[in-house]
Amino acid sequence: MARMHARKRGRSGSKRPVRKEVPEWVQYTPEQVEQLVVELAKKGYQSAQIGLILRDTYGIPDVKLITGKKISKIMKEHGLYPKVPEDLLNLMRRAVNLRKHLEQHPKDLHSKRGLQLIESKIRRLVKYYKSKGVLPADWRYTPETARLLVEQA
């Protein structure tokens, strides 16, 4: 698939093998995996980071295979998922950092263009999340709300 704001092709890479059953070498029960996810979420890790930690340190290839639930669903069940979705929060974090940079370097036109692209991605995601009911219908993106949300998170 192509990139959103470039005329280049997308990234290719290896794909995860399609598995329908839990590998026999995994020695964790679904309850243990769920408990690990909750512990890591309480430490402040995002769901993507939790997946990497479980894969690299605990040898758990896929949480959904073992528990039947995605990491984000486990976090939502225990009330640990953030109010604003993580992908939107990460984009807002990038926009806030770029705004700080542009305050010190106002003539950096390449970064100014990058900020425009990031904010257009944010607006796209906000539109999607409003239609899905994840965000309230009157929620609006402004640089100030983004700064407050990033500082809070």
UniProtKB/Swiss-Prot annotation:
Give the PANTHER family listed for this entry. RIBOSOMAL PROTEIN S15P/S13E (PTHR11885), SMALL RIBOSOMAL SUBUNIT PROTEIN US15 (PTHR11885:SF6)
Name of the protein this chain belongs to: Small ribosomal subunit protein uS15
The transmembrane residues are: none
GO CC terms in record: cytosolic small ribosomal subunit
Q: Which organism is it from?
A: Methanocaldococcus jannaschii (strain ATCC 43067 / DSM 2661 / JAL-1 / JCM 10045 / NBRC 100440) (Methanococcus jannaschii)
Q: Which HAMAP family does the entry mention?
A: Ribosomal_uS15_A
Region listing for Disordered, in residue ranges: 1-20
Does the keyword Ribonucleoprotein feature in the UniProt annotation?
yes
Identify the Gene3D superfamilies for this entry.
Answer: 4.10.860.130, S15/NS1, RNA-binding
GO terms under biological process = translation
